[in-house]
């Protein structure tokens, strides 16, 4: 009899624990859904708070991890405080690393990690920036291994090629020695254009793809590149805002467009 009662109690405890776990998971999912709504409304601060609330319930909840990384980096991108910007970028990288640990075979974790490291590296001098180039490339390529049509990872690869090609003098020498000749010489303006054009084709309403493609055309400056740059930049200036940082992207596009006109 006692054994039967103990078994019944154990079963009840297991059922309650299971129900609690399901409830927590549902709540985490609810916070992610609310974060997604805030993201769609271009409210990055609110989106990040919801994703963080989900992680407070389940610290390894993959959708919340990679999306929290995305929003943290977006918040840091145009932050005028270098300290605050660094904090957001570090937060984005931390969430990205936790995301790939939680699900190493999904494309989005690797993409946001590459993006976070890439954005953080752009705050550094060119020589210091090179030290992160290898990991950025590896993470972006891993993302593309799991989804060759991930527009964000394609964007990172386009930007990676462009940043290597923008190096000059001692920075270029340092990059070749640090990355190794095979990786360094794999970078080209044509590859930068190829990857960014694919990102634009896959996600044509996203203004940042057009902005960076315009900047690549402007810097490559081959043939009718300046006319192509103008076309992309005008698209950004006249395009519809769909993301938190689009107003800032429009300002950058307008400033570069003024140099062409």
Regions from the PLM with identified roles:
Residues 7-17:
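Bacterial N-terminal signal peptides
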Residues 19-58, 62-77:
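N-terminal leader/linker segments that initiate helical-solenoid repeat arrays
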Residues 1-5:
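Positively charged n-region of N-terminal signal peptides that target proteins for export
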Residues 37-46, 60, 70-105, 112-149, ...:
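Short coil/linker segments at helix-helix boundaries
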Residues 22, 28-29, 167-180, 186, ...:
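Terminal, low-structured helical/coil segments at or just beyond the last alpha-helical repeat
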